[in-house]
Amino acid sequence: MKHYRIFSFILLFICAAFGQSCSISSSGREVLDMNTDWAFYRGDVVEGSRTDLDDSGWIPVALPHIMQLEMKHCGGNSIYDGIGWYRRYFKLPAKYKDKRIVVSFEGVMTNCDVYLNGQKVTEHHGGYMGFVADLTNRIDWNGNNVLAVRVSAEPDPLTPPGKPQDKMDFYYYSGIYRDVRMVITDKVYITDPLQEDIVAGGGQFVTYPEVTKDKARAHLATHVRNLTDKDQTLSVFSQLVDSAGHVIAEAETPVTLHKQSDRTVEQDLFVNQPALWHPYTPNLYTLRTQLLSEDKVLDETTRKIGIRTIRYTAEEGFFINGEKLYMRGANRHQAFANVGDAASNSMQVRDVIDLKRGGYNAVRAAHYPNDPAFLEACDRYGLLVVECIPGWQFYNPDSIFIERLYEIGRQMIRRDRNHPSVVLWETALNESRYPVSLAKEIFELSHAEYPGDQMYTAGDYFGHAEMEPYYDVFYKQVSKFPKDGDVMSNYPEDFIVVKPLFTREWGDGVGEKPRVSLKESEEEQMRQCRSRIEQLNGKGYFDWCMLDANPHMGGHFVWSYNDYARGSQDETMYSGVVDINRYPKFSYFMLQSMRDKAVSQPGLYEGPMVFIASYNASGDFASSTTDITVFSNCDEVRLYRNEKLIGTQTREERTPLFRSIVEKGGSPMFVFNAGEYETGTLKAEALVDGKIVATHSVSTPGKADRLVVDIKTDGIVPVADGSDMIPVYFKVCDKNGSLIYNSGQEIRILVSGEGVLVGDTISRIGINPQKVEGGVGFAFVRTTKKAGKITVKATAEGLFAGEAEISTKPFEGKSSLPDGKHALFTGKEEDNVVVKPSSWQKRILEKPRLKIASVQVGSSQDGYPASNIIDNDDHTWWIAGEDRLPQVVTLMLDRPTYVAASRILFQKDSSSYKHKVETSEDGERWELLYERECTGWEFKPMTVDREVKYLRLTIENVSEGRAGLGEISLY
């Protein structure tokens, strides 16, 4: 036995040294990749699980997979939300006959039924958590096996989040969109927490009861199960290995496991001078646990762990390893262009890298549990995570919805409790109205699942004050609506310290320019930056709690990291600091400048940065002439135009304008007056202690001359597994390589070698050919199963072609489940495609608005007049001048007019408004049109279909704040 352990350790060390994921053949556990060789059918199939079904016309696909590729800008509930079937053939050798065989699904959206050889194995509800299908006693050992999965993306109010997609601010999308693996173990094994139903148990749970800089104790609770009819005399052997491959702690515990029984084995590992995990020093250890029987390894698991301790205080915020850390975070949606949520693990990693380079030390996984690969990357690169139960502006009192929510909450904690990056668990249904009993139950089950002082739950205070006992950390800690009714007022006396304070979302919905597309000008991008830096400095929406200006603020999360499509509106949500393709806007660099210049992570980023927020393209914009903004986290910035010094500014000089930001460790903006515009080159130098530590130059773009193909690697070598994805940008540039930022050029793409262009030849989704946006195009290339070179070429009329190459590496260190015997799958991606017709709402919005003669209200807050209701601007508001309800708003037309529809946009997107709408032809006799309660996000047109001279809106109740409107439009 000792010799075997030494051999295993040596092999583990070799694997760690060369960055490989190794499989020890005698470990008793085999994990087989199942991401390739699937057949897919879009639509429902009678008895689609039959082994003798003719599936030759089905579409050959690889996972991750969305049931229908979509346009990049696919808002307005235009995506596929129906049924789909998947089939995977395989044959297993007889050596596995006495083994436990399960298939692990990381994510299937939304509900699914799993079959093997025509027999139902299990069903699962909810697309954001994985599950296990046990095939142990169902395998056909004499021939082919057919694993079939019926997936439903149809609306389901009983499965959280539950809200229909046409009312959602994001999309669920569809399909088997995360990894699938077959796991083969002995029938005496270490369990999977998602298969077991044990509070704070199943699998392995690692906690750290003692953590100091001098020593730490890791407590292991390993759950083992015996499926045999024989008692087993065993031992559990655990080793902790550092990054250099040295075993620094180990423990062996004997255990007797009776037949058909299970047990949790507890062990302690002691570490001297531990390398603690921290966002800026994300030290990880390898924990390997073996289940031993005499000289045989029955099972083995290996995981990365990080030793750290956290605490939150109401007065000072967040502490990690005893040191205070201010969280600067972003909200991230997991969706990508064309493929929705179905992106490979490498794309999850790239998002983490991009967030870290963008100056963030934290991310809010809004509004659902993210991909395991994303969390593993957060552990590896050092990104704190707020993990959320799935929910958004919806609560269903049905007991099925509630029980599924509880189960998802339990499973989320069991899956992710060992991640050092996860430091806050958002157990509130985001922006929803729900009973105190629900908050109490989720709070109690969360602390039961993660006992001790390292579990912190989070929710909103304002609007939920009665739930104070059931959250450990609060967002929105304000005592009341602003006393003057101005939602952009910030009165320090209104801010309270009930619990530790964070702001979950800021930066969208209010301000000079909260949303901007890369198709817009540099000046529009700068408007977004100016808006957000003012908000950071304390001049934001009242329930953002003044952000950096609040002395009790522990951190905040900008909305949002990335642009994304949503069901509630046709237009893409342009709130991101990067677009859907992850191409950065100016605001990416503004927030990057908030990071500490003294903190660098080797191989990831260097601390000092400088960025000129200008295309230097036109004298029409102040951002190229009199207000050239430079973002930097350094002490001093010099700006040159054509080698002539425009000026020098210091951090100290700029601090008075941005004092709150600077006091929280952030940076001011540096704004230079360059006078008259000149073509040429702007160059910025950033200095620390008088030395230049970073530079950035921007040259005036000339005439479009060429295409540049930019394969975004981020140091990641793509894997030839038939499943990996590579992001590629296509830039329209002048002869010197400067981006033509306003180009909408049509380009064509050719991929050759060992890669495939995702969505090639599908004109419906506009990938090839495609029109670039803001001078930049984008596409995914998927790898084949053969390692080799991939060449990506782009052409456009009148421009020199661009070309780039990348090589893939073999799929080593892991095994794939071999394909079974079946007919050739001949289906095409567009078979049975579902193109939703232009919605009635969209057609209505394309009509001209009717002129409204006048509007009357009961009261108005200063600065928010009634005229804002009918000024054709959604971003100007009417707010009632008093808290009294109801508030009545009456519109009058010049004469009785046929009105097809009305569109009512309420002032606050997260508040719920109970209201009724009536119409009249004479102002005396009123006819009820409808009564409803909705949030500010639900602003699609409603049918009127009658003659109207007067329309009366009565706002009867508001969940948070006063009655308010953005706009009322009639069509």
Each language-model region and where it sits:
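Active-site-adjacent substrate/metal-binding segments within catalytic domains
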Residues: 65-92, 96-105, 109-116, 122-125, ...
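Trp- and acidic/polar-enriched beta-sheet ligand-binding modules for extracellular glycan
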Residues: 882-885, 908-971
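Accessory beta-strand-rich segments of carbohydrate-active enzymes
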Residues: 32, 44, 81-196, 227, ...
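Disordered, acidic Ser/Thr/Pro-rich linker "stalks" and the adjacent N-terminal cap
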Residues: 27, 55-63, 116, 827-895, ...
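Accessory carbohydrate-binding/adhesion or oligomerization-edge regions at the termini
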Residues: 20-71, 150, 154-159, 175-177, ...
